[in-house]
Amino acid sequence: MNFSLTINSFFFLATLGLPLSLAAQRAPAASRATVSGTAVDGGAKAEPLPFATVLLRHAEAGDTSLVASGQTALDGTFALPQVLAGAYRLRVLAMGYQSLAQAVRVAPGQPSVALGLLKLRSASQQLGEVTVTGQKAVVQQELGKTVINVEKDLSSVGGTAVNVLENVPAVAVDATGTVSLRGSSNLTILIDGKPAGTSNGGPGPRLDQIPASQIAQVEVMTNPSAKYDASGAGVINIITKKDKKEGWNGQAALVVGNGAKYSPSLSLSRHVGKATWNLGYDGRDQLYRTRSNSQQTALLTDGATTSSLYTTQDGTGTQHNRNHSLNLGLNYDLTKEQSLSLSVQPHWEHQSELDNQTLTQQTVGSPTVTTQYGQQIADVKVTVLESSADYRHTWEAHKGRELTANAGMVKIDANIPVSQLLTGGTAPAGFKQQQQVNAQIYFGQVDYTLPSADGKGKLEVGLKNQVLRNTGRTAMLKPTSTDPSAEFQLDPTNSFAYNFTQVMPAAYATYQRTLAHGWSAQGGLRSEGTFINGGVASGTASVNRQYVSLFPSATVARELGKESGQSRLQFSYARRLNRPDFMQQLPIQLYQDPRNYRQGNAGLLPEFSHNLEVGHQLNLANGASITNTVFARFTQNAIQRIRTIDSVATRENNVGVVTRETYANVGTTNSFGLETTWAQPLAKWWRVSATGSVYYAQIAANALNTANRAALAGTARLANNFTPRKGLDVQLTGSIRSTVLTAQGRQLATGGLDLALRQRLFSERAALTLRVSDLLNTQVRRTEIATPELQTALYNKFETRVAWLGFTWYIGATKAKPDRIDAAPSSGGGFGG
């Protein structure tokens, strides 16, 4: 592909909106006003209400159409720009509160209308002698977006971003920390809009290194607009806390868990004049225990001869995580309309794993059983350095107009030595492997937003580029004999060095508009390119792939019901992409250990999907809310892992069954599902929220000659929040995930129950927390694999039942707010498998 032509096509797409932008800027705005205000709790403290919906309608006879709408910021403020002179009716809606209505009049020539504080009363309903009082929800559902207020969710407080995502509707986290959305682990994860999530294969910090105490909210977009990256089943944006109170503010915390688990943290900010300085530290020194068991029967072929080999493996071990993270940042207001932010975030990770194993091997029909005893040791050290700069320009005279720019880099250095020593039997006495990875990610993005002259529309355009450079080296060493004291020597056949560069430019344009009779619409188009080039240093294998794709998106919504904001129906569509990574395409044998190796597929194509959603949201006067979403995903060139038995290597290596794993496009798969969220106050001291999903998933088979399979699967979560007395918060949370199909078999059902308490102390200057994760110790990972040549049963148990005790001290103007707990880490390992 001609690279210069590709760049020109991106430039052409990015400038499609330029004539519209210039025309909009010429339109006069002097006769229009900005309507602004602040939504607050009607109580004595008048706390701000973030994420409240603000609607402005005509108040003239025969015309009650919607003029403008918006959402309050974290501090409760809102601004509706470009409002013509006239009479209007403003309505503010927040979950758990009675809606507020107020008349608004804009006089000709008036530049602004400041409404001041708009106090919303808690929704209440009399049930006999019990008063039901609404509270702000932990999970706030918006059609197309789910917002999770982490500060008020006790089940993940003090843990990490992984623990937070475990509680998000439609999101699942497995034992390795991999995040999946509606069954797909291919998704885009952002932190404050920047790349993140190395645990899911993306650039940026590991999600298990981001403390939950530093997260304000999480946004989940299952069908995002063209403004966002097209890669993955959706977008998860983790928004961190930002404090601009005058002077010193922050918090210090120490959390201790049974079995040698410690988590200290410190977060400080200082706002002086135009500058806000931020300093943060988070540490983890935690020891976990593990158990595992596997039983496997493999069918081996050697010409016309076949035989079956039965193997077992029992293991017990430990995992020791020691991590340190710093966060240094500066936000400076250059002018009233311009700001600049700088941040540097170094991370140090050290993970030690020790696993003692007992292995048996027996040819089916033979009385001879070979037993070996092994010890596998891994000592992983990773250093991550992030740095970024952000620029923001707004126009006070033209509310809603905004220019933002972001640039930064992420540098990753990893050293991963793994060794296995075996005693007994006739097999070689283990192996040693040394892996080194060095990666640099450079990214930059520019976005421009321009409201239309009548204030009912908005144009957004943007450019983005991301460059990934990666070099790595793997050295495999084998023993010279079966003697446990034998020397190890380099195995050049399974040792190699590689390097690659991947460039991903993108451009987008979207336009949204509020229409008459409660209708609104948004449409957009995104273009993304992928240019990847690299290979093995010896020149024996390489990858060279270039392609450009277009990704349209559209959303149509309408407000229903007699009251504004009471009911809303929305339809959305988006085309999305699963981009194969370098190692999935590199056609070399990469051994993880003597029994397993991966081999890339040079002919692997990108996977494309068409995603559709229909959603309905209903907000009731008593503070209850119900959201239902029906979704469908149609995938072309579905990428699937294919695992087979390497009979030749199994017979020659004398280490048991040797499996080969590769990737292939296996055709088309379809998935359909329903998600439901319900939240309601049952009493003044009790609020309940429930989320559930059920979906019909078609799974691509892991063998090319095997038909696809399909089955129903589902998840459910029920959270009960209690306030038995002032200053004491209690949360009891239960979750379950049904059996789900995998390419080779199925993953059995699992679930758990968590209990958390927090007592605020010293006039809300401090808090004491207690949390017990997996109270019944039921979280376990069990997997079954069934193919014509391989039958496997796997059992993995991570230490999930942990009691955590934490103390938090709030510094400066920061205080422990009701329903907010900031210390009580969750144990790692997802469902505990």
Q: What is each PLM-predicted segment?
A:
Residues 40-45, 53-59, 93-95, 112-155, ...:
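Short, acidic, small-residue-rich periplasmic hinge/interaction motif at the N-terminus
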